[in-house]
Amino acid sequence: MAETTVRSLFRTPPQADLSGVKVSGWVRTMRESKAFAFIELSDGTFFKPLQLVLEEDSLPEYKEMTRRIGVGASVSAEGTLILTPDAKQPFELKVTSLQVLGESPSDYPLQKKRHTLEYLRTIQHLRPRANLFQCAFRVRSIAAQAVHRFMHDRGF
């Protein structure tokens, strides 16, 4: 099964439920209850995260997975993309298979709350995962491409 990016899902949203979708990324947030859990997954390609829905009935290793997964963990998920027009997000992924690629420590520094720039300066290796820096790097990349194209088109 070919892996897709969060960006491609949001840029060209499906018109109907789509099975066989595989995505990988980092867990931004996780909310869980006894029978189901919600994970916001970001792969760094888009500013909005993809919501994953884990249900105990459809995921045999539900208990173990929810125990191992925390904010910052790296996961790969497969499932069915379900349209949710009445919810905040246009769709969500109902997970049928989940693999933990890398666990995160309990003291992982990036949490759901907003962090100050001073704090982000102390964790330089994780700054690209913060929304502020992802946006800044995208703007910088587009500006550099525009300057490069301008100079190239004029023979420089």
Task: Identify the meaning behind each predicted range.
Residues 1-156:
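Class II aminoacyl-tRNA synthetase catalytic cores and aaRS-like
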